[in-house]
């Protein structure tokens, strides 16, 4: 029986499931995954501003420089800047007459 055709119906004044194979491990796993997905969706809707603000701004910071000497920090900054400058040379400048 397909999961899409299983319907809960009132049986003897209680809600029950007509399917006999509800103890099947695949059905149990699908139910657990569905419940977890629903919980994560609710949390996402409740805290989406905090979550996306963290990913937007929090991950833009570079690697931690705690405990690194200032000379090595400056060298790292120069390497990063030279990498950016090198990428600029890949663009073609087209001038219209």
UniProtKB/Swiss-Prot annotation:
The M2 protein from most influenza A strains is inhibited by amantadine and rimantadine, resulting in viral uncoating incapacity. Emergence of amantadine-resistant variants is usually rapid. Glycans are attached at residue 20. GO terms for cellular component: host cell plasma membrane; membrane; virion membrane. One of its GO terms (biological process) is protein complex oligomerization. Residues 71-80 have a biased composition (Basic and acidic residues). A lipid is attached at residue 50 (S-palmitoyl cysteine). It comes from the Viruses. The record marks 41 as: Seems to be involved in pH gating. Residues 59-88 are annotated as: Disordered. Residues 44-97 are intravirion. It holds the Pfam family Flu_M2. The keyword Thylakoid does not apply. GO terms for molecular function: monoatomic ion channel activity; proton transmembrane transporter activity. InterPro entries: Flu_M2 (IPR002089). Keywords: Disulfide bond, Glycoprotein, Host cell membrane, Host membrane, Host-virus interaction, Hydrogen ion transport, Inhibition of host autophagy by virus, Ion channel, Ion transport, Lipoprotein, Membrane, Palmitate, Phosphoprotein, Signal-anchor, Transmembrane, Transmembrane helix, Transport, Viral ion channel, Virion. Belongs to the influenza viruses matrix protein M2 family. Forms a proton-selective ion channel that is necessary for the efficient release of the viral genome during virus entry. After attaching to the cell surface, the virion enters the cell by endocytosis. Acidification of the endosome triggers M2 ion channel activity. Homotetramer; composed of two disulfide-linked dimers held together by non-covalent interactions. May interact with matrix protein 1. Cytoplasmic tail plays an important role in virion assembly and morphogenesis. This is Matrix protein 2.
């Amino acid at each position: 029986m397909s999961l899409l055709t299983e319907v809960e119906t009132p049986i003897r004044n209680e809600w029950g499931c007509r399917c006999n194979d509800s103890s099947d491990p695949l059905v149990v796993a699908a139910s657990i995954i569905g419940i977890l997905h629903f919980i994560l969706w609710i949390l996402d809707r409740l805290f989406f501003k905090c979550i996306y603000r963290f990913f937007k701004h929090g991950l833009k910071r570079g690697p931690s420089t705690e405990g690194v000497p200032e000379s090595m920090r400056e060298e790292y900054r120069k390497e990063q800047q030279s990498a950016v400058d090198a990428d600029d040379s890949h663009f073609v400048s087209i001038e219209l007459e």
